[in-house]
């Protein structure tokens, strides 16, 4: 059993994770540190220091794994390792992660380098994909088939799988070839969640937010929301991994602190981070606050720190990543809206129905932004939302996708948009 993992960024060796006496460390290779185009594994582990200790690398690694204890326990049983040992888990699923990073054993590294790219893809039929989605709905830990060479990990609580889509074919990649799309089947009691997420992403784009492409795709009798990975791109005849990390990783926080109420970062801390690290700080701060406003308007209650990320690139470039995992709580009648809270406070207030003009003014002041400009932007977004939502509903239905959840969210968004405009006119 290995006690070292080689860290790769888009296929280049950048350092080593060491595991000794239940403690971790990460050391950058000198070759990577000397490269003028180098970028850090994490903003919490800058290139200026060659070695970083246990707390930093452990928090980063946990941030790559699912936020679901049951999934981790099942993975532990499957791989015969402790579900509480992040190093052992990553040893098995770290070959395709969020961002450009891969973690592989020294033995696997030699095979990976020597293996022809064409042998790294297991192509699937539509029936194969349907069966994988069916299995995943029944067993939320079945992100990959046991026989797959390629294993992957993504953060988040929802069951999902990741596949390569190329030349109109789906496949399971491994080694140097990354997954390009994330597939999420409908789950649990949230009927129409796949449609809800797809609709919310389209709505966000319509009001000027940057989001990945998405669609709801049917594979025989199974459906899934299919989201293009923004941390993948085609360049120079190959798939390129683009590095990213979520806000918890960037701030050296374990994923258990993703919610502000659990000690995680709130709006002000993320604004500070963007001002400290972003290559275009004011543009990214504005985009982030637009996202906060959007989630307030649609009642997107799960926009915690792990659902905001940073793109890390050459020459120290850092930018806010596209938004993802957007969804509205509005179409679910069993939810008591008087008790609904956001994942991050707005001007000191969590509760959705209590957030008004003075809270946005307080948030603007804490973010060192002109409050009139911020609030005018939110009003404009609220005013535009009902018509944009109706247009998207019509477009989606024209593409053959119809679900009561979409109709419900459109209907309730129209009412909520009017209510939010009134809240922004009254000082509460």
Segments (PLM) and residue ranges:
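Phosphate/dinucleotide-binding and metal-coordinating scaffold of catalytic cores
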Residues: 1-428
């Amino acid at each position: 059993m290995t006690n070292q993992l080689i860290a790769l960024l888009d296929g280049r060796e950048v350092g080593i994770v060491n595991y000794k006496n239940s403690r971790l460390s990460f050391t950058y290779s000198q070759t990577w540190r000397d490269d003028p185009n180098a970028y850090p594994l994490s903003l919490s582990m800058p290139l200026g220091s060659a070695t970083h200790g246990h707390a930093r690398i452990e928090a980063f690694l946990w941030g790559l794994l699912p936020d679901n204890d049951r999934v981790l326990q099942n993975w532990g049983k499957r791989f015969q390792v402790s579900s509480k040992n992040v190093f052992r888990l990553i040893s098995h699923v770290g070959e395709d992660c969020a961002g450009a990073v891969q973690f592989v054993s020294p033995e696997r590294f030699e095979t990976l380098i020597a293996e022809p790219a064409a042998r790294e893809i297991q192509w699937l039929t539509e029936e194969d994909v349907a069966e994988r989605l069916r299995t995943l709905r029944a067993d939320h830990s079945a992100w990959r088939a046991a026989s797959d060479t390629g294993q992957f990990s993504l953060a988040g609580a929802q069951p999902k799988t990741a596949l390569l889509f190329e030349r109109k074919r789906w496949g399971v990649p491994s080694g140097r070839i990354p997954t390009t799309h994330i597939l999420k089947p409908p789950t649990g009691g949230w009927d129409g969640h796949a449609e809800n997420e797809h609709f919310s992403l389209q709505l966000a784009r319509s009001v000027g937010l940057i989001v990945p492409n998405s669609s709801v795709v049917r594979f025989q009798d199974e459906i899934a929301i299919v989201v293009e990975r923004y941390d993948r791109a085609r360049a120079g005849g190959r798939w390129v991994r683009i590095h990213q990390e979520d806000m918890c990783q960037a701030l050296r926080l374990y994923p258990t602190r993703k919610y502000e109420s659990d000690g995680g970062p709130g709006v002000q801390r993320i604004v500070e981070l963007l001002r400290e690290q972003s290559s275009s700080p004011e543009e990214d701060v504005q985009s982030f606050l637009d996202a906060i406003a959007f989630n307030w308007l649609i009642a997107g209650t799960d926009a915690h720190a792990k659902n905001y990320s940073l793109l890390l690139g050459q020459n120290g470039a850092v930018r806010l990543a596209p938004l993802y995992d957007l969804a509205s709580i509005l179409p679910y009648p069993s939810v008591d809206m008087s008790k609904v809270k956001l994942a991050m406070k707005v001007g000191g207030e969590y509760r959705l129905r209590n957030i008004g003009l003075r809270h946005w003014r307080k948030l603007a002041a804490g973010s060192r932004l002109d409050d009139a400009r911020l609030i005018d932007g939110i009003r404009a977004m609220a005013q535009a939302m009902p018509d944009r939502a109706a247009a998207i509903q019509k477009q989606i239905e024209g593409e053959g996708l119809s679900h009561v959840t979409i109709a419900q969210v459109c209907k309730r968004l129209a009412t909520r948009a009017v209510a939010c405009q009134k809240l922004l006119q009254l000082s509460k």
